[in-house]
Amino acid sequence: MLGATALGSQAKAWARHDTALKSSDSPGLPLSVGRIKQSASRWCYGKIPLPDLCRSAKQIGLSAIDLLQPEDWQVVQDNGLVCSMGYPTKRNDFIATGFNDRANHAMLLRELEQTIPIAGKQGVPNVIAMFGNRKGKSDAEGLATCVEGLNKIKALAEEQKVTICVELLNSKVDHADYQGDHTAWGAQVIEAVGSPRVKLLYDIYHMQIMEGDVIRTIRQHIGHIGHFHTGGVPGRHELDDTQELNWRSVARAIADAGFTGYMAHEFVPTRDPLTSLAEAFKTCDV
């Protein structure tokens, strides 16, 4: 538990970024000097109590906390931030059990039907979903089955103004057998569903591992993307000079493409976590 001690240790780091940081008692001020709304994934900062994380994130300049269960949404809202991506449920097999298997549809639809109206009421703009593990399915079969399932929930998402973001993950290092492991395939699903409320969660860490060519891919598919996650390659650590990507250039490409959603930092800090988060914010604040 870091709490107030961690907050105090951040004073020097925050001072270095004084053009971007806004105090938590000045809600009328913009949270960012740049064009991208930035967020922090909750699980990467699990040792920090959520209210403390919210206060720290707001001081750094972030506007949201990402990947929260519904019981935590109000905590974030009470601290003047947004839950940028909500979970529809708690399940150990959440990633593997996705829309590419018709046997999962009843459960997935029930979870989303219960959660989307709550998200709409509480101002949560996005909920996360998964394509699921391949388990021998062809690309064509998985695509058709995903479209079939997502078509059954898109009307509710449109009605509630909540976007279902289906995540792209790598199957090479972290999630063996995951079917949604290439942008072009995921974009075909989104195109076939044809709803402004069903989009891709483009995880830059995962797609750099699988296919690279990140900036061109983002430009090509920006209309299919509803949300971004960051994470350095290799290792899923800080967005610094140990990584393959020029993160400032990536962020600038996203902003230049007219993206208005959230970029959530989902890296595992190797140093002081809030200092690393402040540095990532500054890097991507374009």
Q: What does each model-found stretch correspond to?
A:
Residues 1-58, 123-125, 180-202, 206-286:
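Histidine-acidic metal/acid-base catalytic patches
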Residues 52-73:
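Catalytic domains of carbohydrate-active enzymes, especially glycoside hydrolases
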Residues 64-66, 85, 128, 165, ...:
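Conserved beta-strand positions in the central sheet of alpha/beta enzyme cores
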